[in-house]
C-alpha cells in the first residue's frame, strides 16, 4: 500500500501561501529570507525526500509551478524529480507539461484513495494546499513533514484551515530527530 507524505514549507504561524513571493501576496517571499546555511540544510532534506519518494502527488497550481522549474535542469536531484511518476489532481488541466505526469480528474478523495491502494514500497509526496485539505479531512495522510521557517506572517493561507471537527495529529512511531 502507498504511503501519503505531506512535505510542506510553513511559517511559525502556519502560513504556506506564496513562499517565493511570486503570487503577489503582501507577506510573500518569506522562503528566500532564510540564511544560506538554513537554505543548504533545507536542500539536503528535500533531496533526501526526493530520493525516498516513489511518486509526486500535486495539485494543478503546484504542477504548473514546479514543472517548468525542474524540466530544464540536470543533476541528480533534477533527474530524480523529472523521472518520478507525477499524479496531478485537477478538474481543468488536460495536458500537463512535466514529464511522467498523469492527471487525476475525479473527486480528490476517491483518486487519492485509489493511489494508496496500489502496492508501493516508498512514499508519495503531496504538495498542494487545496488537495491537502481534502486528504486531511478523510485521514488519507500517513505522515506530515514540516520545514518551519522563522517568520510570523500574521495572515495568509494556513497549513490547516477550518475543519469539520477537532483533529488529532498522531506523532510518528519513530520521530525524526535531525
Language-model regions: role of each:
Residues 1-140, 150-178:
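Portal/gating segments that form or line small-molecule/metal binding sites
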Amino acid at each position: 500500500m502507498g504511503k501519503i507524505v505531506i512535505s510542506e514549507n510553513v511559517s511559525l504561524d502556519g502560513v504556506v501561501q506564496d513562499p517565493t513571493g511570486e503570487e503577489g501576496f503582501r507577506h510573500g517571499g518569506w522562503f528566500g529570507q532564510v540564511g544560506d546555511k538554513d537554505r543548504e540544510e533545507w536542500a539536503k532534506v528535500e533531496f533526501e525526500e526526493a530520493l525516498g519518494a516513489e511518486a509526486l502527488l500535486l495539485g494543478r497550481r503546484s504542477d504548473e509551478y514546479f514543472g517548468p522549474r525542474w524540466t530544464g535542469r540536470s543533476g541528480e536531484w533534477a533527474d530524480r524529480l523529472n523521472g518520478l511518476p507525477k499524479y496531478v489532481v485537477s478538474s481543468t488541466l488536460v495536458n500537463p507539461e512535466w514529464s511522467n505526469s498523469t492527471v487525476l480528474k475525479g473527486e480528490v478523495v476517491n483518486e487519492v484513495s485509489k493511489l494508496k491502494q496500489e502496492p508501493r514500497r516508498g512514499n508519495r509526496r503531496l504538495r498542494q494546499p487545496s488537495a491537502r485539505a481534502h486528504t486531511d479531512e478523510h485521514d488519507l495522510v500517513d505522515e506530515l513533514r514540516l520545514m518551519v521557517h522563522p517568520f510570523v506572517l500574521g495572515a495568509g493561507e494556513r497549513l490547516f484551515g477550518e475543519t469539520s471537527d477537532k483533529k488529532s495529529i498522531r506523532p510518528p512511531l519513530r520521530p525524526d530527530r535531525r
